[in-house]
Every structure is written in C-alpha cells, then in structure tokens.
Amino acid sequence: MSNYVFALLILLQIKHWYIDFVDQTEAEVAGKGIYLNAVGMWHSFKQGLGTVFVSTLVFGLDYWFFSLIIGFIDFVLHYHIDWAKMNINKKYGYTIENPKFWAWLGADQMAHQLTYIGLVWLTVV
C-alpha cells in the first residue's frame, strides 16, 4: 500500500505542476478571480479531472467512485484556493514586483500541496 500512496502523491505533484504552470491559459488566470467564472472554473475542473485520472491510474478502475470523490474535492478546493489568492492580490494591488505577491503565491501552492496530502490521507483511512 505504501508504494501506491507514494505513487499517488508523486503523480498528483506532476499533474498539479503541469496544469498550473504549463497548461494554464491567460484567460484561465483572468477568470480565476471572478467567482463562478466558467473559464476560471475550467482550470480547477482540469485539476479535479487530473486527480481522477491519476487516482484511477494508481488504484485501478475498481476504485473509480473513490477517484471521482477525491477529484471533486480537489476541484472545489483548488477553485477556492485560487479564487482567494487572486482576490487578495487584487484587493491589495500586489503584482509580481511586490514580495507579498510571491508570499501569496507560495501560500496558494502550499494550500494545494496540503490538499494533496489530505487526499492521499483519505486513501489510507
């Protein structure tokens, strides 16, 4: 079981990096700060769908329903974490030139990583 847990955590990290830093469009970035914006939600939906994919890859199709549950949790949490970060930066006018922008980006990424630790924890309880 520990190999599966480790594999899931690694794949969630790779999935997160790819969707957040390689695949994300400018429209998705702009939409994340507007609550329930379809394009901003699409970004988080891709994260949730990616979680379903990697969980199914690790645990197999017999656990498809569990994969859907943790994918949905990831979608909801990812959306709200991103929305909060975008609105904090917007409210205070933080841009990439401001160290507080980077502090909030770091907090955003930490929250996503804690989400993945929580999702992995759900696989072992």
Predicted feature locations:
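Hydrophobic alpha-helical transmembrane segments
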Residues: M1-V125
